[in-house]
Amino acid sequence: METLSQRLNVCQDKILEHYENDSKRLCDHIDYWKHIRLECVLMYKAREMGIHSINHQVVPALSVSKAKALQAIELQMMLETLNNTEYKNEDWTMQQTSLELYLTAPTGCLKKHGYTVEVQFDGDVHNTMHYTNWKFIYLCIDGQCTVVEGQVNCKGIYYVHEGHITYFVNFTEEAKKYGTGKKWEVHAGGQVIVFPESVFSSDEISFAGIVTKLPTANNTTTSNSKTCALGTSEGVRRATTSTKRPRTEPEHRNTHHPNKLLRGDSVDSVNCGVISAAACTNQTRAVSCPATTPIIHLKGDANILKCLRYRLSKYKQLYEQVSSTWHWTCTDGKHKNAIVTLTYISTSQRDDFLNTVKIPNTVSVSTGYMTI
């Protein structure tokens, strides 16, 4: 009994030293788990001898000591395997080598640099759950260690190892648990992923797909430096005249997307009269520029815009129409931002929209007028 008590004192003193030192060396953490294992063995032996209290500590049941010892052995072996690789030179804290983190999804491996992934179920901002993804996941299999990165998609959080995808968080199961299981939004790293994506149009359409034909203005009006024309208010348009290009083939349209051309026919060039901004005020729009409509172009990542467009359904009274996600076809592929266009009955309605709807910082807003 006395020998067992002395051994337990020495073992626990060593464990306390590791807590106080808070080392970042992997070899020190291996030694820590060796002593945790030894402590469990001593407790197991004490209970086996019929001892229920030692050094004023309650001796746990045999099954408890055995389970803790097995966990300590597993972690010790994991760290020893890692210690035989180049990763032993990295900084390792006690938290990063703790049992709690080891058992956190993905279980049975070490991980570093976690960040939060927020999932919103059923479009309810009050029905959200937070999950953890990891920048570095250390997989030790058959004595070999590999580092992979945790990734996120609409199905869940996963990593890829040797071509095999392993999901350690399944959003489908989580959605059934916390919602109807039909739809959810994933917010991670400044990106927004919406599921199911089928509720949105994923077609990439050109600007001609939105405005297929513009009315011809008979008279061209000169303007000041600020003008009101097709597109956004970025830049200044000059009064121009052009001739109508003859059409060689009839224009065919997609019955599912009436505004989208099926064949690569060009859109008619028209005499688009440029009207001064002063003449395009809301009060005089119906008289001086009856063919123009206030618009907003929202530019940014396609997934973020799809999510934003879905949320705009809550503010239908603040706009007239909203387009599907589209792109300019003549831009450099490296900077191919997606665009969503909204139209308004009046500029005051557009102002109310901008004052009410929260636009993400990653989405740029351009205002202007469109001839419809």
Curated annotation (Swiss-Prot):
Pfam families in the cross-refs: PPV_E2_C, PPV_E2_N
Major localisation: host cell
Matching SUPFAM superfamilies: E2 regulatory, transactivation domain, Viral DNA-binding domain
Keyword DNA-binding: yes
One cellular-component annotation, GO: host cell nucleus
Region (Transactivation domain): 1-200
GO terms for biological process, alphabetical: DNA replication; DNA-templated transcription; regulation of DNA replication; viral DNA genome replication
InterPro entries registered for this protein in UniProt: E2/EBNA1_C_sf (IPR035975), Nucleotide-bd_a/b_plait_sf (IPR012677), Papillomavirus_E2_C (IPR000427), PPV_E2_N (IPR001866), Reg_prot_E2 (IPR033668), Regulatory_protein_E2_N (IPR036050), Regulatory_protein_E2_N_1 (IPR042503), Regulatory_protein_E2_N_2 (IPR042504)
Compartment(s): Host nucleus
Record-stated family: Belongs to the papillomaviridae E2 protein family.
Protein name per its UniProtKB record: Regulatory protein E2
Organism: Human papillomavirus 31
